[in-house]
């Protein structure tokens, strides 16, 4: 992403704004939905469900002119959201339900210093997600040990 004409101050302001806009979604995705879904589904499937809803949540942006979404295809975006939600699932569970790491993960996705998305990014995400799921297969396919407390101060794990 090139530096805006107004200088570095504009990019710092944008980063500060993005620190709240995207990551605030994590209160809903990981703070509420993930723990509730993990009470009934293995973390892998909870993440896949969240990723699907997360992608659909952004669907209206694809119809707004002037947004980056307007130039993208929805299907690769949806697949990317599903893989990202699955990727953040072991982060969330390893952090015992803390929202800090998922929020930082979300923020780095929309960080204006990263290069623009490329068509092959989805394939890279699929490969990385497959590897992460395989490396965490004991915890990704079983509800035991997953965080199930909803936005509480102390996270609880499914016994």
What is each model feature region?
Residues 72-131:
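Functionally important transmembrane alpha-helices
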Residues 20, 33, 84-88:
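Hydrophobic/aromatic residues in alpha-helical transmembrane segments
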Residues 18-23, 51, 55, 77-82:
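Residue-level hotspots within the lipid-embedded alpha helices of multi-pass solute transporters
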Residues 1-15, 66-80:
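Juxtamembrane helix-entry segments on the extracytoplasmic side of multipass membrane proteins
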Residues 134-152:
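Membrane-interface capping segments at transmembrane-helix boundaries
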Residues 23, 92, 130-140:
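Structural signal for the C-terminal ends of transmembrane alpha-helices
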Residues 24-51, 93-98:
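Membrane-interface helix/loop boundary segments of multi-pass membrane proteins
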Residues 51-61, 106-115:
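Aromatic-anchored segments of alpha-helical transmembrane domains
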């Amino acid at each position: 992403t090139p530096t805006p004409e107004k200088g570095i101050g504009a990019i710092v302001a944008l980063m500060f704004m993005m620190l709240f806009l995207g990551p605030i979604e994590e209160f809903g995705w990981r703070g509420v939905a993930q723990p509730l879904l993990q009470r009934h589904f293995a973390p892998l499937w909870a993440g896949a469900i969240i990723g699907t809803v997360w992608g659909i949540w952004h669907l209206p942006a694809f119809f707004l002119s002037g947004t980056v979404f307007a130039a993208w295809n929805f299907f690769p975006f949806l697949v990317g959201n599903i893989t990202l939600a699955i990727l953040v699932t072991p982060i969330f569970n390893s952090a015992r339900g803390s929202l800090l790491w998922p929020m930082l993960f979300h923020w780095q996705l929309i960080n204006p210093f990263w290069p623009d998305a490329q068509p092959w990014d989805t394939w890279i995400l699929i490969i990385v997600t497959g590897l992460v799921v395989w490396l965490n297969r004991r915890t990704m396919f079983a509800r035991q040990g997953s965080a199930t407390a909803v936005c509480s101060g102390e996270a609880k794990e499914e016994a």
